[in-house]
Amino acid sequence: RNSCWGFCWFNNIAIAVAKQRQLGTVKKVAIVDIDLHFGDGTSNIFQDNPDVSYYHLYNLNGLEQFLSINQDCDLVAVSAGFDMHVEDWGLILSTKDYTTIGKMVAEHASKYCSGKFFAVLEGGYNHRVLGKNVKALLEGFDMR
């Protein structure tokens, strides 16, 4: 709390979640962080708040488990980093995995949060694959 790690200093997801809670539009929020780097700023900001749950993606099964225990949330917020891609620094997720993540979030929000979810762009360094990965996540979000 006495220093910063770049992106944690201006924390878009934390500002957006705090503002929605301040306005009273939501009470309980589940934050899903799919960026390669652990969101220590986000985690720190909400660590003492039982109404905000934070999950940093390690695998899709973990995301499924996190969502299953957060059925009482009013909103799902996604820190949408794309540097976990197999052609980026993380070497973990495929483009199809981003579609799966988007679908999991959208289905959860539809079932438990009156359809309320949003995402903010975080990391992603390989410009050759960044656009298609963002598109894949958005396609997963589209429940039509």
State what each model feature region is.
Residues R1-R144:
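A general "terminal functional-core" signal
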